[in-house]
Structures are given as C-alpha cells and as structure tokens.
C-alpha cells in the first residue's frame, strides 16, 4: 500500500484464470475468422455494460403515480420505455434491436386477482434492454421447466404464496415479445416519490417471482444448486 | 456491422431505425383470428426447429392480443422471410394444459405466443 | 405430457445434433481453471461476476447476429444439454463459457488445436511482467 494514502486500493484479483484466457482466446479467434469484427464486439460490450434493472423499476414507479402513463405502458411498452430512457430499436448497436431481445416489450399489469410471472421455457429470453442481465436461476432448466407446470410450488420456493383464488398467469416469452411485470402498488407507500417507489421494485418483482414491499430494496439471495436429478416429481 | 453473406445486410437495410418485428408491419395480410377467439394449437410435424412448445399442442385457448406480424420462427431460422404471418398471444387455463393441475387453483392460466400457422378454430 | 417427455422434446432437437463427448482442452480448463467465486473470495473482491462475463455475452450476441454462425436458440439448447451432461457442477458463467467453446468446436467454428495454441499465447501476454 502506497504511503500517504488514507484509503486502501480496491481489492483486485491479481491472478489470470484459465477461464479468462479461454474467453479471450475464443473471442480473438472468432474475430480472426470473420465471425464478427473487433469493432462490433467493442460496441456490443459497451452496450451490454449500460443495461440494468433501474429503468424498468422507474417505469413501474411512474405507472403507479400516473394513470395515463400506466395505460400507455400496458398498451405500448416500447413507447413507454422511451420515457425511462430505453430505446428498444435504436439503443442496441444494430439499430433494429438485438437478435435475442427484439423490440416488442409488453408490460403485464397485475391486479388484486391476477398475478403475472415470466419465463422463457425454450431458452431463457429476457427483456435485457430495460432489465439488464438475467439471473442464473432464470436460465436454469429447473426454473424453465417447472414454472409453467408447477407455478405455485416454484413461487413458494421464492417465498411468494398467493391466495388459491388469485389467477396466476405464467407468461412464456417464446417468440419476439419480452415481458416485465407491473406489480400492484403495495400499501404503506402513500405519498411516496417516484424514487422511493422505484427503490422497492426489484428485479425479482419485475420478473414476477416477488412482490414489492416497503423497506425491501434488494432481491433475496438464492443459493443455486445444480440439479442432481431431472425434475419429474408428481403432485 | 461486419460484412456478411448471410442475409443480415438485407435485414439491416429493412429494419434499421424501425425495429424487428416492426419492420414486417403490413406484410401479413388480414389476420385470421381476433381478440376473444377460441383457438386450438395444431400439432404440425416439427421439421427441425420450432418455437411452438410441445406442451401446448392440441390445447384450446383464447386470443388475448393480436401482437405483431413477422416471419414464423420456423421460416426465419432458414432465412425464409418472404411471407410474414400474424402472431397471437393466447391464454390457456392451466387445467387445459396439464390435466392433473390441482382443482384448488382452477383460475391459473398461461399465456404464450403463436404464429398463425399454428392455430385453428377448435 | 410428463416433465420427462417435455424436457426430452425441448432438448431433443439440439441434443440429436450435438456431441457432448468430452473435449480434452476444455476438460483441462475445467479441472485446472480457477472459478470466479473462488478468486473473488481469495482476493476479497465483492463483484459477483468476473470482468469477462459481459464480453462473453457480447460474443454470444454477435455469433447469433453478425454471421448467424451460432443462432441463439441452438446455442442455448446446447448449453442446457452440456450443462447437464458434461459441465454439471461448474458454476455459471464458467459453465456458459465452456458450453460455448464446446459448441463452437463441434460446429467447426474453431478447432481444439488452434484454441489451445491461442490460449497459450494469451496467457503469456497476460502474465508477462
């Protein structure tokens, strides 16, 4: 540590892992073989770095505060996204959306009697331009196969239990539409600002496996266990 | 974008600034189904590649949105983008998809999209 | 339809074409490579992801877009298959990286020999003082 510094340098991994080397080697060979260009890769990397869940949280907060905006969000998710700084069409380096996200966001509005939850059984498609990178559990066959079949059980594992009379609607994004959930605004948030509201709309609320609660501003940590046996239990 | 021999240049020319699926707007002709229609998922033979989930085959649901026009995924994967179709969002009762889905949760549903070729009147 | 049938049909399409037999270079990386969770813990780094996770995502996007060399759906099916059959127990994103390299080798996009050679060069470059 250098003398005269009052703060230690941020810790860094001071070691080169074979995985880091493999990633770089694959990328360099792909570029040399013309599978894509170095320029394209740099632009894509920059773009992916800009993505995160905050715009989606703000979209929900805005919708809670403004009934007209909520109607727009439900009617035209791509247009509503522009108001939180996300351009599904021109944002990505292609100028026409990304090859896995496309440009058709639909905002699914929860009500007291309908709760939405999102999955992509085929390949774990996710609304990255407005929500960032998907969490590992979302990508696993365990989640993808089980949510469509046993949504109540999977949601219970996430700590979410709903009245049997509530309609749980699983949205399987198998084509070009990508979904985020617009949860019901919780009690105890009267008079809150947009910032305060956005803070409790976590990524898990936007996927639909959690509901927003005053005071809860982070996703629950989930241990991920590799599936030892494929899932086919009977209930 | 990099030089390509796959037809991404054509797609880029067509879709830049417009978006995908927006770039196919107006190409599919009249929609066969409308919101509220009951539809059954056809069990077409899968050649190689499909985005129509097997768990929906033969099930009857209700069109909830007519969402966009696009080449069917089965054509698009072979770069066959000449004949876009209408795509529909269809809602199914879970009980319809899984016969032993618990009766206690009879209101539960599932929503997913199909291109027109996959649907027929029940 | 049972879960087993469902998973077979989803995975069957790609699995029929993918050879999941081990590739010795990748088995070596898998057994000798240090995963991010271990490195982060050892060095006290709090970032949950390695710095190369995003560059890997960009590579996957571009393989699907630019030349359509490896379309997204097929890459993901192969990744599912390999995650279960070959690279089970490897943490994500190391698992995603191994699956990608495996898919690319099996499709002839890169070959094992040149990848091994390039890895050696990259390693030298990154570790030279």
What are these regions (language model features)?
Chain A
Residues 2-235:
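Terminal, compositionally biased segments used for targeting/anchoring and flexible tails
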């Amino acid at each position: 540590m250098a003398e005269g510094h009052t703060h230690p340098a941020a810790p860094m991994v001071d070691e080169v892992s074979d995985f880091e080397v493999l990633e770089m080697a694959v990328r360099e060979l792909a570029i040399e073989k013309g599978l894509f260009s170095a320029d394209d890769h740099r632009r894509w990397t920059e773009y992916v770095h800009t993505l995160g869940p905050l715009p989606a949280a703000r979209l929900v907060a805005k919708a809670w505060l403004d009934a007209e905006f909520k109607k727009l969000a439900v009617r035209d998710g791509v247009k509503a996204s522009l108001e939180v700084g996300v351009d599904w069409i021109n944002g990505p380096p292609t100028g026409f959306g990304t090859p896995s996200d496309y440009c058709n966001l639909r905002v699914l509005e929860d009500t007291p009697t309908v709760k939405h939850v999102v999955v992509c059984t085929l390949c774990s498609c996710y609304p990255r331009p407005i929500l960032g990178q998907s969490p590992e559990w979302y990508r696993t066959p365990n989640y993808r196969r089980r949510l469509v079949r046993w949504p109540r059980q999977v949601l219970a594992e996430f700590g979410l239990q709903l009245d049997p009379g509530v309609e749980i609607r699983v949205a399987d994004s198998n084509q070009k539409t990508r979904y985020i959930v617009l949860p019901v605004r919780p009690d105890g948030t009267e008079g809150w600002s947009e910032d305060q509201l956005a803070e409790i709309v976590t990524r898990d609320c936007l996927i639909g496996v959690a509901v927003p609660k005053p005071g809860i501003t982070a996703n629950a940590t989930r241990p991920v266990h590799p599936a030892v046996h494929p899932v086919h239990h009977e209930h | 974008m990099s030089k390509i021999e796959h037809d991404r240049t054509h797609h880029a020319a067509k879709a830049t600034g417009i978006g995908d699926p927006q770039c196919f707007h107006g190409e599919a002709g009249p929609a066969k189904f409308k919101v509220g229609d009951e539809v059954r998922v056809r069990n077409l033979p899968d050649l190689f590649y499909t985005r129509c989930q097997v768990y929906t085959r033969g099930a009857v649901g209700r069109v909830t949105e007519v969402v966009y026009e696009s080449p069917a995924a089965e054509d698009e994967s072979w770069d066959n983008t000449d004949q876009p179709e209408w795509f529909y969002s269809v809602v199914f009762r879970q009980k319809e998809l899984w016969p032993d889905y618990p009766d206690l949760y009879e209101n539960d549903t599932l929503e997913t999209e199909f291109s027109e070729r996959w649907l027929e009147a029940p | 339809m049972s879960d087993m049938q469902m998973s077979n049909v989803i995975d069957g399409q790609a699995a029929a074409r993918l050879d999941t037999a081990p590739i010795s270079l990748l088995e070596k990386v898998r057994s000798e490579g240090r995963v991010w969770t271990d490195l982060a813990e050892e060095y006290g780094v709090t970032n949950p992801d390695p710095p190369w996770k995003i560059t890997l995502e960009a590579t996957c996007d571009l393989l699907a877009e630019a030349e359509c060399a490896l379309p997204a759906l097929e890459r993901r099916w192969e990744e599912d298959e390999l995650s279960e059959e070959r690279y089970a127990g490897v943490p994500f994103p190391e698992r995603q990286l191994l699956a990608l390299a495996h898919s690319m080798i099996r499709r002839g996009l890169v070959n094992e020999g040149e990848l091994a050679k390039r890895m050696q060069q990259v390693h030298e470059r990154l570790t030279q003082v």
